[in-house]
Curated annotation (Swiss-Prot):
It comes from Serratia marcescens. InterPro entries: Hemolysn_activator_HlyB_C, Polypept-transport_assoc_ShlB, POTRA, ShlB_POTRA, TPS, TPS_OM_transporter. The gene is shlB. This is Hemolysin transporter protein ShlB. One of its GO terms (molecular function) is protein transmembrane transporter activity. GO terms for biological process: killing of cells of another organism; monoatomic ion transport; protein secretion by the type V secretion system. PROSITE patterns: POTRA (PS51779).
Amino acid sequence: MIKKITALTLLVSTALSAETLPDSHMMQDMSMGESRRALQDSTREVNQLIEQRRYQQLKQQRLLAEPAAPALPQSAQCLPIAGVYLQGVTLLSPADLSALSGLPEQCISSNDINRLTRELTRLYVQKGYITARVQIVRPNSQGELGLSVTEGFIEKIEGGDRWVNSRLLFPGLEGKPLKLTELDQGLDQANRLQSNTTKLDILPGRQVGGSVIRLRNQHAKPWLITAGTDNYGQKSTGRWLARATATLDSPFGLSDFVSLNANSTLENPAHRYNRAYTLLYSLPYGAFTFSGFASFSSYENHQQLPHNVVKLHGQTQQYGLRSDYVFYRDHDQIDSLSGQLTYKRIDNYFESVRLEVSSPTLTLAELSASHLQILPNGVFSANLSVEQGMPWLGAGRHPSSVHLDSQFTKGKLFANLSQRLRLGDATYQLNNLFYGQYSRDPLPGVEWLSLTDRSAVRGFSRSTQSGDNGWYLQNTLSRSFNLGATTLTPRLGADVGRILPRQDNSGWRSSAGISTGATLRYQRALVDLEVSRGWILSNHATPEDPVQVLARFSYTF
């Protein structure tokens, strides 16, 4: 009896394999596409949450130093001094001091002394030491007039609470020189929480040169919940999705932040679905921001074959730790470095058979440098990063192929220019976004660039183009109209991109798309509509995509 059952099982399996063999590559591509989309969507959500509200202080009015009063009454009359000496200068280098104007050798006037004190004060302000003060000291035995600098320090920081944790936002600053950029950094960290509107006052302290930093915060409710629906899904798993996002500010009283995103398809969930969840936690510490994130997604769809229906399903897991460090900032730019370690596990199945080629396990180490620049009419930001696959946590060379190695190296470049344009009497917003990636190594499919994804070249609902190397450029022109409590923002978009797949010798492939749409905001409600069309430019045999209509509705509680 056992032999008969075994023979029957082998017969059915052989028949199924024979029928589905011609579609094996299609199944691999479909499963890989679902996994890639899920991982890249969760990565995009994490990056947007981390970047959101990070640089508020650059956009607000900065703390300014009061103009220094003249050290001496203005006069061109010669003073009875032989020269000038400085004392109390510890925060300026000899190279900084060499930029000061020289004094006349024969006749030093009050005007010369006042010019020197202004230049010296300006040097301190340019370095961010806005409380430095210069005082006159009586001449020494050599007849040299003294300029004594009180450089200024933070005597005390007060006004913190569970929403604005001064120990983590301004760590170790008490007793140290008062530097404007360090205060701006702490304000940025405080204001990255949507419930905070934090400002500070610099007040005189009790000690000579001391200042008291008093924090003032207007606090709103610490939580937000956003619910919505859209038709951004895929045909195979369902177009319409329900989405929900919940955020909570300072859950542990550490000026920390936690966010949970969830989405699920709505159509026929018993037979096809796509569900995804992303959790993010971040903690500030001065110029550092530490983050941890996790995401999980699963999908299932059924493919109709000539004589039966087969099930394609799978899941992805992603866990990561990240650290961001702002190493330089001034009144109109911020430069930062970040390091990230990410673990990815992908499991795709055709019926009960695991698709090994499209089910890699990856451990990635990433280093990146970011630059943000405030321009007269806009903002420019750029990020350059390098990812390296590591042989950790079960990641290694794929057992079924010598060409699929998890220890690859990939470079990425992201740049965004957002600027205001005056056309006649109207003000428009032009946004140009560029993304490119390159690797000399063959990449696992989940690391490819999806050119026809909604976040790349807009306008595709059926065709797919993806590959190891490539780039795309998104261009969007918009204008906002304020109608009382309602804001209407229509837009036009034009995108182009190219990819170079390594799995064949077809060379570069190109795509382009155009779009038009509008966003309507009324209080906490949002409605967005978009009509787009995409074209595959490098393969005329590819069926043309139809006009795509996308809709999104959301409400924030």
